[in-house]
Amino acid sequence: GISSLLHSLRDAGVKLAIASNKYQDGAEKLVRHFFPELDFVMVLGQREGQPIKPDPAIVNQIMQAAHCTDRQKVVYVGDSDVDMQTGANAEVRTIGVTWGFRTREELEGCSPSAVVDTPEQLLKAILG
């Protein structure tokens, strides 16, 4: 599942972060509830005075916190057209997942690097 995927990514040295359009408090509560044992570089949600996705500001803030300047090393994973647009606007690689809000066809319409159907496929798409 997702927890196993995140642990595998962490163990492979991947820095993890969350960019959400949920309100900041809600995003943090969800992460603490479902992934209390994982350290994320940053968990960002909707905040007063900050633009929301698909504005790339949220990705730029996370990259800065992760001390990452190479956009080719960043993968933005999401389940919606807004997520795919956010990654494209931030000029990073995007991967759509089909277990969320949008269909494969809708995600593919946004021209992501890949669209995957399982956490195992996502792990392979990220790590190669």
Predicted segments, located by residue:
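A short, structured active-site edge motif that brings together acidic residues
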Residues: 37-52
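Short helix-capping segments at alpha-helix termini
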Residues: 11-12, 35-39, 67-69
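Conserved Lys-Pro-Asp/Glu-containing loop-to-beta segment of HAD-superfamily phosphomonoesterases
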Residues: 53-84
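Acidic, Mg2+-coordinating phosphoryl-transfer loop and its flanking beta/alpha structural elements
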Residues: 75-116
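Surface-exposed amphipathic alpha-helices with a cationic face
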Residues: 3-11, 63, 84-89
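Phosphate- and divalent-cation-binding pockets in alpha/beta enzyme and binding domains
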Residues: 26-29, 86, 106, 124-125
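Short, acidic loop-to-helix structural element flanking the phosphoryl-transfer center
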Residues: 1-18, 24-32, 56
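Short beta->alpha linker loops
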Residues: 1, 22, 54, 79, ...
